[in-house]
A protein has these predicted regions:
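N-terminal secretory/membrane-targeting segments
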Residues: 1-77, 109
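Solvent-exposed soluble domains appended to multi-pass membrane proteins
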Residues: 50-436
């Protein structure tokens, strides 16, 4: 008899249980994926996420205190995080594109802390938003944003709210899409979406949302309100224009509305340029850290199960008054964004986030995934966990990957540990916000 739990379950019920789970947004890790003892998994995770400026609060989970750097000032800078729909790294001139469709983003990269080896955790907007807000590795099935028991979770807003920040999620579409309204409103975010735009504030819209320029102009007004209220702010802005049918206002760029992906990318780049042109005039600009990244790539299909190049996205952290431009080539992932920003703020805090400060303590690893496949990248290797087999190891070489014998056992255990622990923490309610 097979010792593989997946094979046993399929043998018992002809796949009913697996496919029921599949179509209900959740695949139970313990039932369908390779495991190691839970205590061992948690110990491995703890060893991999602890930073020299942190100490654990107990010996059973990842709760830890983050100390400030006494050699640096602490200041509550505003944080504006712009997630651009489907902005693959390959669209930018900084990554070798020769079609001149991202002139504003390329200039921004030159003036920013620019991360060249940065990866999305998944292939859907909700997976990217999950990674950035919760700073948690992807779990099997759908994003936590679309699953039950996702309210009052420990997330970026938990830390910023305690520090006195006003917190908002600004979206160009209707936030009932993919359960965004429920998730964000029940996790400390004020939600501003398409329903909050007056007709005068919309120059163009399509099925996905208002034009990116309208969204970003609306965001400027909201940030002005926050500044006038005298509170620092954390604002997460999600664009929509770089999405089929790729339509946008006429007369903005030299490519036509509906002209395909390149046209939509260039339009979004135009809107970003206009946003920063206006933002630089604001009194709050010099005290605001801007983070620009993508939710996921434009495509995820490839000749292999997890084509690494189809998860490669840009990350820029920008403020010309306080941050010196530089290029960072360390491997990193969307779950590292908020811990890195908190490192720049130098705010002491208690955390349950899974990411690391990649400017000061880079982990040099990344997480990628589909609905079923879970990938862990480190040391030029990719470990893939699937619900119907043991973990497989691949050697990475440029954009190519080659399956190898499992001679990277420690790395395989790391991969299993992160995905197993993250899944069990979600299932057991350990991602929930608690008083420290």
């Amino acid at each position: 008899m097979s010792t593989n739990r997946y094979a046993i379950e399929i043998g018992k019920n002809g796949g009913y249980e697996f496919f029921t789970a599949f179509f209900n947004n959740s695949l139970n890790y313990n039932r369908f994926y390779q495991k190691i003892p839970q205590d061992t998994a948690i110990d491995i995770v703890r060893a991999n996420i602890i930073q020299p400026n942190q100490e654990f609060l107990n010996n059973k989970n990842i709760e830890r205190h983050v100390n400030k750097n006494n050699n640096l000032d602490t200041k509550k800078y505003n944080v504006v995080l712009i997630m651009i729909e489907s902005l693959s790294a390959k669209f930018m001139g900084k990554f070798g594109n020769t079609e001149s469709i991202t002139p504003n983003l390329d200039k921004l990269a030159d003036d920013s802390i620019f991360f060249t080896n940065f990866y999305a955790t998944g292939t859907r907007t909700v997976r990217g938003l999950e990674a950035v807000t919760l700073s948690v590795p992807p779990t099997p099935g759908s994003s936590i944003i679309r699953r039950p028991n996702n309210t009052n979770l420990f997330n970026a807003s938990t830390i910023f709210k305690k520090a006195g920040y006003d917190i908002s999620f600004i979206f160009g579409g209707y936030s009932y899409f993919d359960n965004l309204n429920k998730f964000f409103s029940s996790n400390n975010y004020k939600v501003i979406d398409r329903s909050d735009f007056s007709s005068e504030e919309i120059s163009f819209s399509n099925v996905w949302g208002v034009a990116d320029e309208d969204l970003l102009f609306k965001a400027l007004g909201e940030l002005d309100k926050n500044y006038k209220a005298g509170k620092p702010f954390l604002s997460l802005i999600m664009t929509t224009s770089n999405h089929r049918p790729y339509t946008f206002p006429d007369g903005r760029i030299d490519l036509p509305s509906g002209g395909g992906r390149n046209a939509a990318v260039k339009y979004t780049d135009y809107a970003i340029g206009k946003f920063f042109e206006e933002a630089r005039k604001k009194e709050w600009f010099k005290d605001t850290i801007f983070v620009i990244t993508a939710d996921h790539c434009a495509a995820s299909a490839g000749k292999v199960n997890l084509p690494v190049a189809q998860y490669h996205i840009p990350l820029m952290i920008y403020n010309p008054h306080i941050l010196k431009p530089k290029q960072i080539d360390n491997l990193a992932s969307q779950i590292d964004i908020i811990p890195t920003v908190l490192g720049l703020l130098n705010l002491p805090h208690t955390t349950k986030l899974w990411g690391t400060d990649i400017l000061n303590f880079p982990a040099n690893r990344a997480f990628i995934s589909t609905y079923q496949l879970l990938g862990y990248m480190k040391d030029e290797h990719l470990i893939i966990l699937a619900p119907n087999s043991k973990a497989k190891a691949y050697q990475l070489s440029g954009t190519n990957q080659y399956e190898i014998d499992d001679n990277v056992g420690n790395l395989t255990h790391e991969a299993i540990s992160f995905f197993q622990a993250a899944s069990s923490f979600y299932e057991n309610g350990e991602l929930v916000e608690k008083s420290f």
